[in-house]
Each structure stands twice: as C-alpha cells, then as structure tokens.
C-alpha cells in the first residue's frame, strides 16, 4: 500500500505531537517517533511518549533512534536489546539494529506492535 498524501509530521495526536503519522481509511495506520540517543532512561521515556500518542486502535508504531555522539554504537545496541529482552512479550531481531517487538500497555491492557530501529550517524 502506498500512502500518497496521507503522511504528516509533527502531528497533534492524543497527548502531544508525533513525528510521523500515516492515516489510512480515517485511522492511524502508523505512528512513529524519532529521538536522539541520550541513554536508556530517555529511551524508556520515548516508548512511554509513543504510547501516549496512540489510542486503543493503534497497533503499528515505531521508535527510531539516532546516535550522534556515542563512539561505541555496539554498547547502545546491547543496552536496547537488553531492554527489549526484559520488556517485550515477543520480539524478532531483524538485524543488529532493528527489532520487531510486541509490548504490553498496562494503561489499556493491550499489546502494541513496535518497531525499534537504531541508526549510527556519528561522524
């Protein structure tokens, strides 16, 4: 499916603005949040922020994290993977920096599909 003219950025959604929002048939087909890596605590906050933007109908979401400063990208990958192993109901490693996860939202008692992607953009 192609989402021509259905994608917006910085879109108001529930509680705040999401970075990437794709609408299909009057529903959110995808909600994405982009962050700069600032440690695992900020990563957890970003997951909660993503959940805050989604409603009970929204099941396809993504957190995209960019590393700008940490020269040891492998340590970031390990931190995130450890968090995923501890918090995801299910997960699949797509490659060393992308995971497909099912996370449980306590507030709605629903499972949400979250793609987590890390990208190293250090110079």
PLM feature spans:
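Active-site metal-binding core of divalent-cation-utilizing nuclease and nuclease-like domains
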Residues: 1-26, 40, 106-108
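Hydrophobic anchor at the start of a short beta-strand
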Residues: 6-8, 61, 114
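Short His-Asn-centered micro-motif
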Residues: 11-14, 33-34, 64-66
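Conserved catalytic cores of phosphodiester-cleaving nucleases, focusing on short active-site segments
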Residues: 20-22, 30-36, 53
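Residue-level signal for short segments within beta-strands and strand-turn junctions
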Residues: 22-24, 65-67, 120
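Hydrophobic/aromatic beta-strand patches that form the interior of the parallel beta-sheet core
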Residues: 30-32, 62-64, 115-117
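Catalytic cores of nucleic-acid endonucleases
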Residues: 36-88
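Domain-level recognition of nuclease-like catalytic cores that cleave nucleotide substrates
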Residues: 68-123
């Amino acid at each position: 499916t192609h989402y021509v003219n259905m994608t917006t950025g910085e879109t108001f959604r529930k509680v705040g603005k999401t970075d990437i929002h794709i609408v299909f048939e009057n529903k959110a087909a995808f909600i994405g949040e982009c962050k700069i890596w600032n440690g695992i605590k900020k990563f957890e906050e970003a997951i909660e922020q993503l959940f805050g933007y989604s409603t009970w109908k929204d099941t396809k979401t993504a957190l995209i994290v960019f590393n700008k400063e940490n020269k040891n990208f492998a340590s970031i990958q390990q931190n995130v993977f450890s968090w995923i192993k501890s918090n995801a109901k299910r997960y699949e490693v797509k490659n060393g920096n992308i995971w497909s996860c099912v996370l449980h939202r306590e507030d709605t008692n629903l499972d949400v599909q979250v793609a987590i992607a890390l990208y190293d953009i250090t110079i």
